[in-house]
Structure formats: structure tokens, C-alpha cells
């Protein structure tokens, strides 16, 4: 039940990212999606007796002068916004967290997509031009329900969610960072 709840929670977190939902917290949706997805996959791995790879490291950031300059300017301007009873500090901080995430994503997107495309290609035995095509193939593999691929799927999806967490945090996995917190074992 715990694993099922966590996976449904990850899906629900996506609703926070809908820009049309009044009161939705976009950045919280991103954070929850990454961390809950990863934790759910860790729980599945525990139940199945799988060992997961945490030895991932961010590469040197890619230089994207236009995106970097624009997002940094947005961060500076958001930090200067006056606060009031109608727009409090925490709301300004949440607003600023969006371009901060996008800045990190801009820096590491090529790595994230390259690694994910490569791993999906290894799983399905094909080469893909972009992440969209790789994800479509991955969706087909999942829909096929071939239990022989479950172990590889758990490992692939865990690495993907761990990479996203790394991008959000701007760091390698760190046990001191709540984003990388591992849940207590389910089976104990």
C-alpha cells in the first residue's frame, strides 16, 4: 500500500504544475514529483531485493548564455519585488524558485536527456534522436507489462528521478539534503 500511495502521490504532484490551477505551487510539484517518484522506486526495489545505483555525479554545467542571463535577471528582479500582506516573503521565494530550477535544468538538461535516451535505448535495443521518441518507446515497454523487464525499468526510472533531484538541488546526491532523504525500510 505504501508503494502504491507514493506512486499515486507522484502523479498527483503533477497537478501542482498546471499553470491554470489557482493556488497551485509549481515548484512544489516539481520537488514532490522528483522525490516521491524516487522514493517509490526505492520502495519497489526494496520489496524486490534490488540494489540501486546512487553513484551519479553532475557533470560540468553546460554554458547557455542566453538562458542563463535571462533567468539570472529574472531571479534578481523577483528578489527585488516588494512584499506586503498580499504578496509575502514566502510567495516571493516560491516564485523565485521556478527560474532557479529552470536555470539548473538549462545547465544540466543535455546530460539528463543524453543519459536517459541512452538507458532507454539499451533497454529497448534501439537508438533515439530525442527524449520524446525514447519516452514513447519506454511507454510501450511499460504497457507491454513484460515482467522480465521490471528490474531494468525500476533501475532506469530510479536513475532518471535521481538525476532530476540532482538538477533541482544543483548537487550530487547528499544525505544531508532533504530532497535525497531515503525512507526507512518498509520490510523492517
Q: At which residue positions do the language-model features occur?
A:
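Ordered, small/hydrophobic-rich secondary-structure cores
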Residues: 1-18, 174-186
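ATP/Mg2+ or Mg2+-diphosphate-binding catalytic cores
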Residues: 4-66
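C-terminal amphipathic alpha-helical interaction region
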Residues: 68-97, 102-188
Amino acid at each position: 500500500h505504501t508503494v502504491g500511495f507514493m506512486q499515486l502521490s507522484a502523479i498527483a504532484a503533477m497537478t501542482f504544475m498546471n499553470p491554470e490551477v489557482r493556488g497551485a505551487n509549481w515548484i512544489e510539484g516539481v520537488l514532490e514529483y522528483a522525490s516521491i517518484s524516487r522514493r517509490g522506486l526505492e520502495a519497489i526495489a526494496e520489496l524486490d531485493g534490488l540494489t540501486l545505483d546512487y553513484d551519479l555525479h553532475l557533470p560540468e554545467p553546460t554554458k547557455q548564455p542566453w538562458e542563463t542571463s535571462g533567468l539570472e535577471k529574472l531571479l534578481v528582479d523577483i528578489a527585488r519585488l516588494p512584499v506586503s500582506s498580499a504578496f509575502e516573503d514566502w510567495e516571493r521565494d516560491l516564485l523565485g524558485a521556478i527560474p532557479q530550477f529552470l536555470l539548473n535544468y538549462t545547465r544540466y538538461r543535455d546530460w539528463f536527456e543524453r543519459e536517459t535516451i541512452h538507458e532507454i535505448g539499451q533497454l529497448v535495443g534501439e537508438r533515439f534522436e530525442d527524449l520524446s521518441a525514447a519516452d514513447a518507446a519506454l511507454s510501450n515497454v511499460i504497457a507491454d507489462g513484460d515482467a522480465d523487464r521490471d528490474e531494468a525499468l525500476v533501475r532506469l526510472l530510479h536513475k532518471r528521478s535521481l538525476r532530476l533531484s540532482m538538477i533541482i538541488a544543483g548537487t550530487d546526491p547528499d544525505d544531508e539534503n532533504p530532497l535525497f532523504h531515503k525512507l526507512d525500510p518498509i520490510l523492517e
